[in-house]
């Protein structure tokens, strides 16, 4: 693995005049950008993670620009970091309609309790009311827990979180049509931690059954962190390369073929709404996959679904409901473990609110070691804040719709921006529309182009397809951090 955090591009021979025009600053920045691309391109081939390489390249270029006294206006117009799939409400500038109205997205940081009282956010001064309200709710929640003799300040023996919050989250799953109870819900520090605990527990459980390392199926492109986790726990990794003809989704015929060819597969990582492609399985497509799996279940081969729900809640509600209801079939639910998170659906990436729902109540106790032997006990303040945020969203459901509207606005604007760029200098083979979900845009580049050449020519940094187990003629752009201007 290449170490990139100490890399530095030597630009000492690039002369910076004491004072120089905006045009000269842009020319200098583009020269620096070209040098940075030449330096970082080989690092990808040395095995470093593409997402981190691209993000590091952008950060170092910004640093170099400031060292050369290039003004912020030029930096922001010539360097657009769309690599990391984060969401930063403090940087939201979009306002549709009248200030303070339903389309004033600048208010989201205040409305979701991210902003402190008195922050100046792009012409809007925050009240901090929700910020303070959340702290009052934390106190109320702690009192409610203590009344039931639950003290989050001491060890939770199983490390799965307090039963009141777990019951609330089970209620959310019930609203999707899934008959689960709080005992089937375990808390985790975000989706990644939750997936890690499941993979650790399932590896032990499956090896105890067969005395062999189990196989796991990962369709690509897809989020690759669970792959690293699975590899570390001894799984045999099986990949299937999906294609644009099927909107990058695994078909029933393809699933059947893979399962027949790899009899060791016992776990299937299914991203219901996909990162990076932004396409989501329809209810019909999911049922077709279950039909294939059912034939194996009935033959005595248990294959479990690890269903990643990280982006459920970012699409149209009625479509998400239809998707989730398909899991209610008793045999499907019994073979499914769900991983959920508030990170993208509620823009709370830094809070790390995640949880696991185990469809089979009999399997749930078997997975306890993944929690008990890792975190030992979940943080008390974190649990209280988790509960406060749950109450916030339940009491103000319009917040989630407003977030969906912001995501939709940005995805639409970015697609229009990329189309305009493509008219001026053909770089994209196709700009995929997606399924009106996630915080990304997914594009195919023209032959001869890649993420580095695109950055050199446009200043827009994305993540190459290899970051998702795919080919580098594809690229993912994030819309969660940097606002997207309207195309004129």
Where are these predicted regions, by residue range?
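Conserved glycine-rich beta-strand-loop-beta hairpin in the small C-terminal domain of fold type I
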Residues: 80-81, 222, 387, 400-415, ...
């Amino acid at each position: 693995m290449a170490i990139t955090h100490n890399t530095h591009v030597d630009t000492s021979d690039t002369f910076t005049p004491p004072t120089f025009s905006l045009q000269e600053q842009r020319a200098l920045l583009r020269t620096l950008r070209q040098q940075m691309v030449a330096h970082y391109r080989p690092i990808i081939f040395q095995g470093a993670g593409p997402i981190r390489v691209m993000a590091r390249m952008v950060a170092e270029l910004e640093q170099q620009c400031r060292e050369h006294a290039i003004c912020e206006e030029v930096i922001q117009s010539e360097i657009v970091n769309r690599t990391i799939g984060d969401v930063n409400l403090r940087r939201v500038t979009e306002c549709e309609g009248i200030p303070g109205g339903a389309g004033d997205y600048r208010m989201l940081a205040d409305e979701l309790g991210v902003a402190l009282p008195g922050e100046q956010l792009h012409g809007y001064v925050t009240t901090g009311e929700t910020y303070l309200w959340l702290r009052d709710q934390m106190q109320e929640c702690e009192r409610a827990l203590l009344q039931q003799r639950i003290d989050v300040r001491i060890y939770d023996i199983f490390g799965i979180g307090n039963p009141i919050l777990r019951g609330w989250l089970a209620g959310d799953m019930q609203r999707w049509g899934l008959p689960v109870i709080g005992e089937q819900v375990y808390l985790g520090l975000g989706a990644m931690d939750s997936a890690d605990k499941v993979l650790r527990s399932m590896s032990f459980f499956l090896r105890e059954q067969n005395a062999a390392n189990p196989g796991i199926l990962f369709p690509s492109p897809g989020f690759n962190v669970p792959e690293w986790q699975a590899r570390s726990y001894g799984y045999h990794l099986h990949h299937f390369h999906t294609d644009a003809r099927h909107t990058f989704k695994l078909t029933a015929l393809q699933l059947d073929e893979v399962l027949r060819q790899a009899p060791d597969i016992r776990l299937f990582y299914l991203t219901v709404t996909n990162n990076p492609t932004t396409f989501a399985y329809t209810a019909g497509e999911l049922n077709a996959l279950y039909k294939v799996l059912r034939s194996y279940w009935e033959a005595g081969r248990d294959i479990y679904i690890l269903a990643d729900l990280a982006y459920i809640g970012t699409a149209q509600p009625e479509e998400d409901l239809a998707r989730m209801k398909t899991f209610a079939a008793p045999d499907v639910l019994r073979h499914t473990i769900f991983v959920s998170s508030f990170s993208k659906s509620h823009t709370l990436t830094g809070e790390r609110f995640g949880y696991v729902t185990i469809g089979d109540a009999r399997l749930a106790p078997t997975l306890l070691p993944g929690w008990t032997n890792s975190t030992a006990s979940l943080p008390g303040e974190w649990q209280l804040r988790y509960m406060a945020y749950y109450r916030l969203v339940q009491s103000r459901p319009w917040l989630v719709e407003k977030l969906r509207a912001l995501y939709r606005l940005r995805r639409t604007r970015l697609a229009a921006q990329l189309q305009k760029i493509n008219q001026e200098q053909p770089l994209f083979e196709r700009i995929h529309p997606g399924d009106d979900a996630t915080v990304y845009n997914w594009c195919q580049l023209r032959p001869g182009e890649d993420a580095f050449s695109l950055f050199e020519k446009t200043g827009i940094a994305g993540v190459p397809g290899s970051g998702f187990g795919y080919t580098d003629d594809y690229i993912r752009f994030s819309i969660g951090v940097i606002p997207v201007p309207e195309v004129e």
